[in-house]
């Protein structure tokens, strides 16, 4: 994969994530600054999602720690847990929000 393809794939996934957050009605504020998407919660906690172009990875930092996702078999998979990116973000959002989030 080249850098252009990497950015297209990540941007598509991050847009999906933003749409899911909007549709959930959860009090999560997505803020994009450069290659970083920060999910800000009412309790002031954050999840930071970062595009790592040199490694063609997505990095996620949350209360649970740091996680790296590589594009394998047409999905972003965590090297530490084997979880798919969106599933892990949903799980981490629930931990940060301290409440059940109804994902659509």
UniProtKB/Swiss-Prot annotation:
<keyword id="KW-0408">Iron</keyword>
<dbReference type="GO" id="GO:0016226">
    <property type="term" value="P:iron-sulfur cluster assembly"/>
</dbReference>
<dbReference type="InterPro" id="IPR002908">
    <property type="entry name" value="Frataxin/CyaY"/>
</dbReference>
<dbReference type="InterPro" id="IPR036524">
    <property type="entry name" value="Frataxin/CyaY_sf"/>
</dbReference>
<dbReference type="GO" id="GO:0005829">
    <property type="term" value="C:cytosol"/>
</dbReference>
<keyword id="KW-0479">Metal-binding</keyword>
<dbReference type="InterPro" id="IPR020895">
    <property type="entry name" value="Frataxin_CS"/>
</dbReference>
<comment type="function">
    <text>Involved in iron-sulfur (Fe-S) cluster assembly. May act as a regulator of Fe-S biogenesis.</text>
</comment>
<protein>
    <recommendedName>
        <fullName>Iron-sulfur cluster assembly protein CyaY</fullName>
    </recommendedName>
</protein>
<dbReference type="InterPro" id="IPR047584">
    <property type="entry name" value="CyaY"/>
</dbReference>
<dbReference type="GO" id="GO:0008198">
    <property type="term" value="F:ferrous iron binding"/>
</dbReference>
<comment type="similarity">
    <text>Belongs to the frataxin family.</text>
</comment>
<dbReference type="GO" id="GO:0008199">
    <property type="term" value="F:ferric iron binding"/>
</dbReference>
<dbReference type="Pfam" id="PF01491">
    <property type="entry name" value="Frataxin_Cyay"/>
</dbReference>
């Amino acid at each position: 994969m080249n850098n252009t393809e990497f950015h297209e794939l990540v941007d598509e996934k991050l847009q999906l994530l933003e749409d899911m957050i909007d549709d959930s009605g959860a009090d999560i504020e997505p803020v994009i600054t450069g290659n970083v998407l920060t999910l800000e919660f009412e309790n002031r906690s954050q999840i930071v999602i970062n595009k790592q172009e040199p490694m063609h990875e997505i990095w996620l930092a949350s209360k649970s720690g740091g996680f790296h996702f590589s594009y394998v078999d047409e999905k972003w998979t965590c090297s530490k847990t084997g979880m798919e990116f969106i599933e892990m973000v949903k799980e981490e959002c629930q931990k940060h929000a301290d409440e059940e989030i109804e994902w659509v």
